[in-house]
Amino acid sequence: MSYYGSSYRIVNVDSKYPGYPPEHAIAEKRRARRRLLHKDGSCNVYFKHIFGEWGSYMVDIFTTLVDTKWRHMFVVFSLSYILSWLIFGSIFWLIALHHGDLLSDPDITPCVDNVHSFTAAFLFSLETQTTIGYGYRCVTEECSVAVLTVILQSILSCIINTFIIGAALAKMATARKRAQTIRFSYFALIGMRDGKLCLMWRIGDFRPNHVVEGTVRAQLLRYSEDSEGRMTMAFKDLKLVNDQIILVTPVTIVHEIDHESPLYALDRKAVAKDNFEILVTFIYTGDSTGTSHQSRSSYVPREILWGHRFHDVLEVKRKYYKVNCLQFEGSVEVYAPFCSAKQLDWKDQQLNNLEKTSPARGSCTSDTNTRRRSFSAVAMVSSCENPEETSLSPQDECKEVPYQKALLTLNRISMESQM
């Protein structure tokens, strides 16, 4: 069966992930819409012409400095020290100029000893704020203004030091670095799990000190345009089987594609054609600091592999459990019908009706019940497995297969498995 067509192309993923052949990722030729959330969790959003932008940043200057980059933070802190030294140095120089200390008259008691130039005043300001205290320059009791200036500079130096140390510690203890050690699988998978189509991705924590507890959440973001050409974004929560996890070992997050899922009516071809993005978040508490962290990632249709399951990463040893991190991204191709979960449920319903109404079932009923899901997934949807066919409705696309033909198909599969 060929999956090549005029409107699809094979996406090459061999360069970065050699374990995935190119034919496993199918995407549309049209230009893909830019994603809202990058793979590293950063938002692809740019705000322009914000009302009161600088005012809002200056009001919450502490948070602004914590969120800024380290090089910008270093420039701000350096300028705060240098400007404070220059300002108070200028004040001491003006005091000395007004009092006549620059004339070096021995009959005049200076306000600040040994300050006869602006350079000397700047050095005295630096020594005062950093509490160096060389002893060569000192303030006298001749001028109360000079004494008051020294007091103000000492208070301001304590404020600046406290502000800088607090911001630096808060920036080093930020949750962003811890969030970088939480890893999401690059691809999400769609495959059969316990007889149902499921969307799966993997989360792993590769630090020795693991998280205490965590909550996983997933949302499907769908882009659409109205009649006037305006783009709208609609968010739909995905119900997860295991949303509360303890991330001691890598965990596979599972979303069952049922009637409440927004992926319920999408088959393999429709997933490749659709324009959506799955946003996944993991909120957790670290056992080292006890603070809350959040890790984010997203999956677009070209990053969803149909008919795959993840490799096992956990090995049970005699005295411990071994996690093979090399298999974290690995997956193996397994059978999965190309039709949607809605079509699978419709075929199951048709099979149940056949079981109730057909009198010729006889003794084969119990044997068929045990393999009902295999019957539905293999025999009944055999006409749906071509992704190039147009998907209109379950009745139009998946035509009913006669019971005798389906039973013959099951018998042939059973005989081939026993050989």
Curated annotation (Swiss-Prot):
UniProt keyword list: Cell membrane, Ion channel, Ion transport, Membrane, Phosphoprotein, Potassium, Potassium transport, Transmembrane, Transmembrane helix, Transport, Voltage-gated channel
Membrane-spanning parts: 68-94, 144-171
Residue positions where Phosphoserine is found in the record: S358, S374, S376
Record-linked SUPFAM superfamilies: E set domains, Voltage-gated potassium channels
Motif Selectivity filter, chain ranges: 131-136
Parts of the chain on the Cytoplasmic side: 1-67, 172-419
Marked site: Role in the control of polyamine-mediated channel gating and in the blocking by intracellular magnesium: N161
Tissues/organs with expression: Expressed in the brain, testis, liver, spleen, kidney, submaxillary gland and adrenals. In the kidney, expressed in the epithelial cells of both proximal and distal convoluted tubules, in the endothelial cells surrounding glomerular capillaries and in the flattened parietal layer of Bowman's capsule.
One Pfam family in the UniProt entry: IRK
Membrane topology note: Multi-pass membrane protein
Extracellular topological domain: 95-117, 135-143
GO molecular function: inward rectifier potassium channel activity
Catalytic activity entry: K(+)(in) = K(+)(out)
One GO cellular component term: plasma membrane
Cellular localisation: Membrane; Basolateral cell membrane
Activity modulation notes: Channel activity is strongly regulated by variations of cytosolic pH; channels are activated by alkaline and inhibited by acidic pH values. Activated by phosphatidylinositol 4,5 biphosphate (PtdIns(4,5)P2).
Subunit-level organization: It forms heteromeric channels with Kir4.1/KCNJ10; this interaction is required for KCNJ16 localization to the basolateral membrane in kidney cells. As a heteromer with KCNJ10, may interact with MAGI1; this interaction may facilitate KCNJ10/KCNJ16 potassium channel expression at the basolateral membrane in kidney cells. May form heteromers with Kir2.1/KCNJ2. Can form heteromeric channels with Kir4.2/KCNJ15.
Chain's role: Inward rectifier potassium channels are characterized by a greater tendency to allow potassium to flow into the cell rather than out of it. Their voltage dependence is regulated by the concentration of extracellular potassium; as external potassium is raised, the voltage range of the channel opening shifts to more positive voltages. The inward rectification is mainly due to the blockage of outward current by internal magnesium. KCNJ16 may be involved in the regulation of fluid and pH balance.
Family statement drawn from the similarity comment of this UniProt entry: Belongs to the inward rectifier-type potassium channel (TC 1.A.2.1) family. KCNJ16 subfamily.
Protein's name in the database: Inward rectifier potassium channel 16
Protein source organism: Rattus norvegicus (Rat)
